[in-house]
């Protein structure tokens, strides 16, 4: 049984959704003066929106809500606030890649309004998971009905690193297993996260393992094998 279903998102998906989102904002006749990207997932969508709508002012703030892929923090919080500026009287669009629980966008919106109560703030996202989100963004490109973990093209190595670590730790707790072949890892990734994860180019698995080795999480014993 798949523990966490995943869905691979392509660059073409991102470009299409960003274009759709920009079109909805333009049609609403509410044009932002400035875009605030929620780091880190909102960076690329926000930049694409600026390009589509001819907006020059783009800043960011970082909200921590998913410290590890597909594992939510107990409470979302602002890690790095918006830089010092005056947003009062401005139309501010807060952008993220996806609204799943809604916590990240809500805390970002409340943060901006608490500092600049006279700002006209709206929110936008490429995707909105309507069945689980506690908050509906003002603008979205694509409504998702069934929850899955979306693997964005800017997050593939990080997701794989987190998934591999989780698998190795849980399997160690259950059976004491510490040595893994690449084939075993691939099979376990498919078992835990579904066959969709096999669409990720195999080169990213190598990058993920290299990062984990640099961070002291795994040790490569020989070609094709790793140790926790």
Predicted feature locations:
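PRPP-associated nucleotide enzymes
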Residues: 1-228
